Structure formats: structure tokens, C-alpha cells
């Protein structure tokens, strides 16, 4: 008998799952599913408790949905990726598996694991799929057959390649001929978990699909105008579903073009399409530059920057007590919800690196430990952009002024007051510099003074980068 095994990883859905669809194509084959939890590996990768809670809930939903299709989900738990190789081998042997199907992951440890799995399964046909990207790594290259290092040329080539042949979404599998089965007992991950707002980050696959549809209908067209203002619900909040594979990027693309067909030609919705392409860009980058997965900067000379070791400054940044309201409100949003508005991710990252001169890798790790949408490629790409260490990054002399950023993107301080209750009585725009208002009003605020003076910090940071660039 032909037995197909689908190995689920970051693709916890039935719809548009390339590996699952391929495994179910042969109607006479027996189909099994497998998920391997690796708690120690997750801890090494700083996976957040909220993301673990989301995965736990999605796994249980997936187990029920697969059972309705007649596909049992086998759950196993081992320490790390190395141990998971033996588990796959064991499951294949116990169930006389003839074919293994899985969707590629592009991070360096995951790729090494998959190489070892295929090496161990000499008598099993292994098929991998580029499921977590719209266009696979290698499909968009320069004329010299190299990976693009600048986003805009990559985007233009990506769009040209997409117009030549757009990948379709595949349907969810039909019920197997053997009929539905009873699902196994509920899964509980052996990893710290923390609750989150399921209204913003849906657990069920159909709810995530509905959220995508609603955003593309009502939000994508206005995304360009609203995306930078954290007090406005102007972003999609789909990042968590994409990070865990509750949605596919192809689903996002097709729904966007169904609702905003002009997005492909620079019209309404095109700016959100750019965000999907940035996601592709960072995934392609880590495939061709695996050192990015090992905490190495893309621009080599930036590794010579003399970062400050200041645990006290790092802690107040993490806690949202720097004395800069927009930075502190953003960090408290992150700590309270597991999510942060994208404009604020840039502001807080710039502040840590270029006002406090703290190594960007400290921020990268902390974000991953808190984010429900933690994604190595996107998080690393964002931090290296802010720190001017990455490909196509902001130039090192571009340093955000946290006060003017707050004034520009939270003009009346609505977002700040939402997350900093100690500033709720500070009126109007002066909330961006509350220490000045308090001094004039003769009021004592339960809010810290700025931990650094921005102009002085800027001078210090420029000197540190310039010394590194010159090799001093």
C-alpha cells in the first residue's frame, strides 16, 4: 500500500498548503500527518510564549480539521531539530511510509535538518515545496544570476516574473475514501504559553481567511494613507497568521488582487503588495546569505562598531521607561499584546541602536521573545535595516529623532496616552515632551526624564559608525 506522510511545520492550515495537496492527490493512498514540537530549539530561537499559544491553538484546530478529512495527525515532542530527524525516520518505519511531503523552511538550522532527514530516508521518496513564498528563491535573480541586494530592483524583477506566471492557490483536500475519523486527544505544547487577543490574531483558519478578506476589501486601498499612524487601525494584523502558516502569501496575493486589481500596476493596494514583496525579499536573502541566520551583519564593517554594554539602558528600553513617550508607548504595546505597529518597530529599533548605541542583536532577540508574529527573516531584516548593517538598509547617518517621530505620527498623542497612563493628563501635543510641560505647570509626573539627550547621542553614534567604517 502507498502511504503518504505530510510533515507540518510552519504551515498550519488546510487551504493552499502545497505539501498537503500533493500528498492527497493520489486518492488511493493512505495519508498521515506529523507535527514535531521542539521546545529546546524554540527556546534557542527565542520563540515568544504568545506565539507558542497561537501554535498550540492552531495545532488543535488543524488536528480536528484533518480528522474530518480522514487524516490522523501524529504529534511528537523532542528537544531539537537534530532529534527530530530520528522521529521522522521512526514514524516512516512504523507506518511503512513510501512518500514524505513537506514545505521548505529557509532558515539555516531548518535546512540542515531537512538535508539530514532526506539522507536518513533512503527508501522513502521525499518531496519539498516552496510554500511560504509566492516566488521561490532563485526565481528572481540579477543578470549575473546573483541574489539582488537592493529592494527596488528586486521588486521590479519580482513583479515582472509574477506577470509571466502567477502561482495559483490549491484547494483544501477532500475527505479521504476511508471517511472521517475521531481526532486524537488535545495537544498541549511543553513550552511557556501566554494568552493573546484572538479578535486581532484569529486562531481558526476560517477566521484568518475572513480577516484577510475584510482587510483587502476595506483596508488595503487606504493602507498607504493610514499605515504610519499607530492610533489608527490601518494595518492588516495578518503577520501572525503568516508567521505560523495559518495563511499563505499566495492567499494574500490573490485576495488582494481580487479586491484591488490595480495593485499590481501601482494603484490602490500596491503599498500593501510592497509589504508582501519585502517579506519575499528577506526570505530570499536568508537562503542565499545563511550567515544572516547566525547573527552576522550583511555589511561586514558594521561588525566593528563599538557597542555600549549598558544593561540598565537595555532594561528601561525593554520596559518602556526611557523618557521618550513614543518609544515607551510602543514598547508597552509590545509587552502587553505581543505585537507592535510597524512604524513603531522602526522608531524603537532606531532608538536602541542609534540613541543608546546598544547592539542591534539585543533588540532582535528581545523582539523575537515577545512578538506573536516573530519571524526570523523579517525580524532580522527589520533590525538590520534600522541599524544600517543590512542590505539596502537606512544609511548609518539616518537617525530618527524620537520626539519628532512622535509628533509626526501620533500628533495629538492619542496612542501615547493609550499606553502611558501616567501621561493621560498631559494636554495636547506637549505630551511628546512632558518634562517641559511639567516644569512650566509646576507638576510632578510619575514618568522618567529622558535617559539620553538625543542630539548628544546622535553625535556619539555617528562617531562610532565612522570609526568602524574607517577600520579604527
Segments the model singles out, each with a brief description of its role:
Residues 233-422:
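Active-site-proximal binding-pocket segments
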Residues 51, 55, 319, 323, ...:
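Residue-level preference for long, well-ordered alpha-helices that form the structural scaffold
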Residues 145-299, 409-410, 414-472:
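Glycine/tryptophan-enriched, flexible segments
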Residues 21, 90, 206, 328, ...:
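A broad detector of short, well-ordered amphipathic alpha-helices
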Residues 46, 314, 445-448:
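Short coil/turn segments at secondary-structure junctions
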Residues 1-166, 268, 463-468, 472:
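Trp/Phe/Arg-rich N-terminal binding region typifying the photolyase-homology
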